[in-house]
Amino acid sequence: MRRHAIILAAGKGTRMKSKKYKVLHEVAGKPMVEHVLESVKGSGVDQVVTIVGHGAESVKGHLGERSLYSFQEEQLGTAHAVQMAKSHLEDKEGTTIVVCGDTPLITKETLETLIAHHEDANAQATVLSASIQQPYGYGRIVRNASGRLERIVEEKDATQAEKDINEISSGIFAFNNKTLFEKLTQVKNDNAQGEYYLPDVLSLILNDGGIVEVYRTNDVEEIMGVNDRVMLSQAENAMQRRTNHYHMLNGVTIIDPDSTYIGPDVTIGSDTVIEPGVRINGRTEIGEDVVIGQYSEINNSTIENGACIQQSVVNDASVGANTKVGPFAQLRPGAQLGADVKVGNFVEIKKADLKDGAKVSHLSYIGDAVIGERTNIGCGTITVNYDGENKFKTIVGKDSFVGCNVNLVAPVTIGDDVLVAAGSTITDDVPNDSLAVARARQTTKEGYRK
């Protein structure tokens, strides 16, 4: 059976008090609507239509060709919004789910189960519901004496008795697609808001003797909509708890989950330890038996087995097996560290390849460079790679030793088994097996201060 989805993303989000389009506010580093799209796609949907309004181009820019789009010029209610997808879906067979673009916590598993329940019951419509302690603001699920759905009533149209009901509509539905678009034309706006409500489609189906199901989820957080910055923070916290819980169940030690931020696209191997205050973002891959020390930040990087990152920042870089970084080091984009490398305190690496066993232990800048196997770079070494207009490359061969306080003025190549004396400023290439000294000879004037 064909499956379709409509994502409602046209709301202005005035309560966010922001210039940014509501569904583009981020949770765990991604726009809310992108989380929704990924869950919808993951549930086995064949085609997605996103309803956009104010800020339409911004949404299209984020979602791209993963969705079709329909424009809702005036926000006249959820039924009116769904009707905007008519040109894409009206004649389609199968099941259509309707999901709000501001529900970033909804999972593909819940959507899969909703669809399966709907199709197994041969229903014309199914609503996803939940029971919550504070149902204010949500539509209430009103059931008849036999426990079947009688109607969904919105907060502003509810009687006091109906407001006391704690089973609420999530705003997420599954429909027989053709029934949905047939009934949408019959929805009226005679309610307190003067809007066209999507739940009225369910009442129309029931009035015609059709089957309407309710599928209740036990995970209330999944259906939480985000309407303001407080709720955005709550969604962020919920997403982080979910992510950390997943990693801990898969063999990762997170010492203080409440202070640890891990993005949804991060992968972490077993027996890795994450210390307090760590942030790991983007498409980062971390191997097994890694230690990420407290207050480190890692973005879009690869950390191989057994590595240790101590109080450092790693951006768009790769760290080899058993390599040690930090404390207080920075790996900038393009830094590639091999196995058993050491990058120590107050070292900055940018667009540089440090081969296996290389060491840069203290107070150095290595940029646009290749450092050979087992080479030691002394404290205070600087690759002078920029002349104000262009960047130039430094190459240091294997098994070389660069002394402290050395300037390597690029472009320059240092060979294998080379010793560069401390305090040198190297401007010319140095061949293999050489000693390079480039500093003024010391002059001592005894008794000068007497």
Curated annotation (Swiss-Prot):
Active site: residue positions: 362
Keyword Oxidoreductase: no
Region called Linker, residue ranges: 230-250
GO molecular function, one term: glucosamine-1-phosphate N-acetyltransferase activity
EC number: 2.7.7.23, 2.3.1.157
UniProt-listed InterPro entries: Bifunctional_GlmU, GlmU-like, GlmU_C_LbH, Hexapep, Hexapep_transf_CS, NTP_transferase_dom, Nucleotide-diphossugar_trans, Trimer_LpxA-like_sf
Pathway, per record: Nucleotide-sugar biosynthesis; UDP-N-acetyl-alpha-D-glucosamine biosynthesis; N-acetyl-alpha-D-glucosamine 1-phosphate from alpha-D-glucosamine 6-phosphate (route II): step 2/2; Nucleotide-sugar biosynthesis; UDP-N-acetyl-alpha-D-glucosamine biosynthesis; UDP-N-acetyl-alpha-D-glucosamine from N-acetyl-alpha-D-glucosamine 1-phosphate: step 1/1; Bacterial outer membrane biogenesis; LPS lipid A biosynthesis
Pyrophosphorylase, as annotated region: 1-229
GO process annotations (BP): cell morphogenesis; cell wall organization; lipid A biosynthetic process; peptidoglycan biosynthetic process; regulation of cell shape; UDP-N-acetylglucosamine biosynthetic process
UniProt keyword terms in alphabetical order: Acyltransferase, Cell shape, Cell wall biogenesis/degradation, Cytoplasm, Magnesium, Metal-binding, Multifunctional enzyme, Nucleotidyltransferase, Peptidoglycan synthesis, Repeat, Transferase
SUBUNIT field: Homotrimer.
Listed name of the protein: Bifunctional protein GlmU
Lineage, highest ranks first: Bacteria, Bacillati, Bacillota, Bacilli, Bacillales
